[in-house]
């Protein structure tokens, strides 16, 4: 028996409610830091095994260039160390080096084209190399093509540090949305065939990006709320995505990922998997099944996470099935929506 068929058989035995004609639903996570944020993390060399064991075939493996400069202050994450010119690029290079070194031994391939997406949909483990924040560009586009050649196919415009790209949700706004460079960057990402991610952006920045982008844009990780927030809202509330903005992203053909921070959607640690699945269903009812995806933020949440290992996402898929969602809907949420946005972005590359 081929290894892929064997693993499918094992997973269907573990999760019998997923037996849709003996086809295992592939899973993608649009925002995951597994092993990246610590030096020499022991999970990096075995990432391929972890993905195969849980049936995760597409992982947005996410670098955080501003990570070494962040800390907790006043109940939220903010910049606590100054950065000099070149520091963010050096941080990016270090993390990228760790990832590329791990890929030499863990049996996972880097997603680079539509053909790779098709293989991933069949169950082969791939990572989409992602940068959370364009800080590593240091305010110019000179190194963007180099990042593309390394395998970057997904860039989140901003993160937690003040930057030349645009305003962030958690700091007092200074630019009224995206800067001129930020607008130029959105266009450049379109031309390079790199997916644009608006997580951590303000509503004004969302407006600017949607006006410019020729391809669908995503919001990889957070939660949708009927309320609004401001930069000085407490804790995770400053990171919410308003329903109005979520609908605008969906109307453009994009998708919104749900992070694993249970308290943000009223779920304690005890109700983790089922609570996450219930929140996914709520999002489906708000913006449509074709615009909802997983964006766990594994290893990126300081506390309160209800998804702590890759196999938890397989349990979420099982919970969605138990709660009555049909196979087509689950496939869209679990894999196809993120894959569709990536495919459209990659196909838009101008040589």
Where is each model-derived feature located?
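N-terminal hydrophobic targeting/anchoring segments and the immediately downstream early-domain regions
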Residues: 5-173, 227-229, 235-294, 298-351
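Metal-dependent enolase-superfamily TIM-barrel catalytic cores that perform enediolate-based chemistry
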Residues: 150-195, 200-202
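A short linear boundary/processing microfeature
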Residues: 212-215, 225, 348
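Ligand/cofactor pocket segment of small-molecule handling proteins
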Residues: 222
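Glycine-enriched alpha-helix->loop->beta-strand junction motifs that scaffold or abut catalytic
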Residues: 152-154, 194, 212-218, 252-255
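Substrate-binding cleft of carbohydrate-active enzyme catalytic domains
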Residues: 188-209, 243-251
């Amino acid at each position: 028996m081929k290894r892929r068929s064997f693993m499918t058989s094992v997973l269907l035995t573990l999760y019998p409610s997923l037996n849709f004609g003996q086809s295992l639903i592939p899973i993608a996570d649009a925002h995951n830091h597994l092993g990246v944020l610590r030096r020499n993390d022991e999970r990096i060399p075995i990432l391929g095994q972890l993905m195969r064991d849980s049936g995760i075939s597409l992982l947005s493996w996410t670098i955080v260039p501003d990570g070494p400069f962040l800390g907790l202050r006043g109940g939220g994450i903010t910049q606590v160390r100054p950065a000099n010119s070149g520091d963010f690029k050096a941080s990016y290079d270090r993390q990228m080096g760790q990832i590329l070194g791990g890929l030499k031994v863990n049996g996972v391939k880097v997603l680079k084209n539509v053909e790779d997406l098709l293989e991933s949909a069949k169950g082969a483990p791939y990572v989409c190399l992602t940068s959370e924040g364009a800080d590593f560009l240091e305010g110019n586009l000179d190194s963007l093509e180099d990042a593309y050649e390394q395998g970057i196919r997904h860039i989140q415009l901003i993160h937690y540090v003040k930057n030349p790209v645009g305003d962030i949700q958690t700091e007092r706004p200074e630019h009224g949305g995206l800067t001129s460079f930020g607008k130029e960057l959105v266009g450049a990402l379109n031309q390079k065939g790199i997916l644009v991610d608006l997580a951590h952006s303000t509503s004004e920045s969302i407006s600017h990006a949607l006006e410019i982008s020729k391809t669908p844009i995503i919001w990889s990780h957070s939660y949708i709320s009927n309320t609004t927030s401001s930069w000085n809202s407490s804790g995770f509330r400053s990171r919410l995505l308003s329903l109005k903005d979520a609908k605008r992203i969906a109307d453009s053909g994009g998708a919104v990922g749900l992070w694993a921070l249970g308290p943000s959607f009223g779920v304690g640690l005890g109700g983790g998997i089922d609570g996450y699945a219930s929140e996914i269903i709520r999002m489906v009812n708000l913006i449509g099944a074709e615009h909802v995806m997983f964006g766990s933020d594994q290893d990126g949440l300081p506390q309160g996470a209800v998804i702590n290992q890759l196999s938890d996402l397989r349990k979420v898929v099982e919970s969605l099935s138990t709660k009555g969602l049909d196979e087509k809907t689950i496939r869209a949420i679990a894999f196809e929506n993120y894959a569709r946005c990536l495919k459209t972005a990659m196909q838009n590359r101008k040589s």
